[in-house]
Amino acid sequence: MEYKYRIADQMLAKKLASKGAILIEGPKWCGKTTTAEQQANSILYMDNPASLETNLQMAEIDASVLLEGDTPRLIDEWQLAPKLWDAIRFEVDHRHDVGQFVLTDSAVPADEKDMHHSGTGRFSWLTMRPMSLYESGESNGKVSLAHLFETPEKIVAINKLKIDDLAYLICRGGWPFACGLQGEAALEQAFDYVDAVIKKDISRVDGVNRNATTTRLLLRSYARNQGSQATIGTIVADMMTNDENEISVKTAGSYLEALRKIFVIEDSEAWNPNLRSKTAIRTANTRYFIDPSIGTAVLGLGPKDLINDLNTMGLFFETLCIRDLRVFADALDGEVYHYRDKNGLECDAVVHLRNGKYGLVEVKLGGDKLINEGAENLLTLAGKINTEKMNDPSFMMVLTGTGDFAYRRKDGVYVVPIGCLKD
């Protein structure tokens, strides 16, 4: 299968030029190893059955032997021998050079008892996610998020994605292997991913045996509460309405933390701007999966189910947009936050860059009525921001699913279909 360009390619190259070792994190099956292979000049596959036992023994006897090879040297599945971490830190210290090692793993963390140093100053971290629509080829990329931060007077782009396309893309997800397949074969990958998480990965995180039925019920409840600031108690209560087996809030919290560690879920933190008047800002995180297909798979939904329930589709579409915005923001040294205050004023995404610039984004599946509502929300929030203490937003955008064009409204709000957006 031909390698597709990843936005992480440029990020990895940048990090290799500034640090001795880079650890690529992210969910399983998101393409970490394949992306690292493109820039590696030598590779050690720790889990190669032909050499696994030898590799593990050598890691115990003299790990430095495993680090020999042209640089950058990729150490894949390094967590199988956690002592490699300290060996790599030592090599980076003594080589006095950048771009020496790239580490990838299967999303299950290493046993830290054999790791005596944090890696601060020697390692850089790179988080990868499933593919954005631009990376998988469904977005034409005619509108750049980076360009929006320059507040252009005019944007023009044509959107080719229709509602049926979006329903399929939500359920397929951004898994690279799925993106190379068609139809039912592509849709099946998310179901396989969820099964692997439930049956194996959630218990491999920290060696704690977790119940598969409880995990599935928890994921279903999480899917029903995505895009909200639901507390763990709310998620548990939702589980109990559909199952007689009780689970405590503490236990549910430990399950969610395990899912967070293996990048199944990735909540959005609250944005706390300077406002003109005192307004209580809700600080609870907003619940999201790292890819919308996880939620549709765990609920047993397909594209036709979403088309028949556009309210539910809207929730999953929001998760897709947050995924893509995070991929794009990473490339711009940015983060994606969420805003909600006590009066119910909400902003689905705040893209905040390291240099202090930020953009406000509302996600709407489509239709003039919803687009107008989104634009009104953005303008209301922008009017509350104390611009004596912080910058005006660089842009306000309604990110849509349907609609034929990307354009700038008379009030300055951009309307951009997700099928036109890139980093």
Task: Name what the model sees in each region.
Residues 1-13:
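N-terminal pre-Walker A segment at the start of P-loop NTPase domains
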Residues 24:
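Hydrophobic anchor at the beta1->P-loop junction of P-loop NTPases
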Residues 32-33:
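Conserved lysine of the Walker
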Residues 85-109, 117:
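Conserved catalytic/switch belt of AAA+ P-loop NTPases
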Residues 113-228:
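Interdomain motor-coupling "hinge/lid" segment immediately C-terminal to the ATP-binding subdomain
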Residues 401-423:
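Domain-level recognition of nuclease-like catalytic cores that cleave nucleotide substrates
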